[in-house]
Amino acid sequence: SDLDRQQCNNCGVVWGIYAPDCDEYTEISPDSIPLIGRPFLLGSHDCWGLVMDWHATQGVALNDFRVDYPWWESQYPDNLYFDNWEREGFVECAPAPGCMVIMQVESDKWNHAGIITDEGELLHHLYGQPSCITPYARGYFKDRTMICVRHKDLPQEIKPWRA
């Protein structure tokens, strides 16, 4: 299933899957998931997962605070981006390629993030949609940006990351 494949990719190890009702066994190996066009799965392939994976292409490892429930809704106390950006080693900065922008989209909390590309666009993974690159300089996402930050270990020169 898609969920098995995504969890296999998250673990980074080969999975053995057995279906006892038909006595079938198969193994799946982790794939390298492209940053653009990946399907959305909350707690796995979501906006923080994309930010983590993009930073990994630059040699920066981030902690995984993804959860599989809609933490940005008012019934949950979590405020994951607001609570973790500094703790993760990000510092506030002016927008530039490689910076992460944290946005507030249809919520009372900072609930979405993306990376500014070399072309000044936004690499992001919006809830329920495939990850994509969107214009950023003005418009919807720029208007919802709460803060622009850059990881302290991110080099000034961004390594190529598009497949």
What feature does the model see in each segment?
Residues S1-S29, P34-I36:
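Active-site-proximal loop/helix of nucleotide/amide-processing enzymes and allied scaffolds
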Residues I36-L41, S107:
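A short glycine/serine-rich beta->alpha loop
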Residues A61:
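Extracytoplasmic copper-binding redox domains, predominantly the cupredoxin/blue-copper superfamily
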Residues P135-A163:
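Glycine- and charge-enriched low-complexity intrinsically disordered segments
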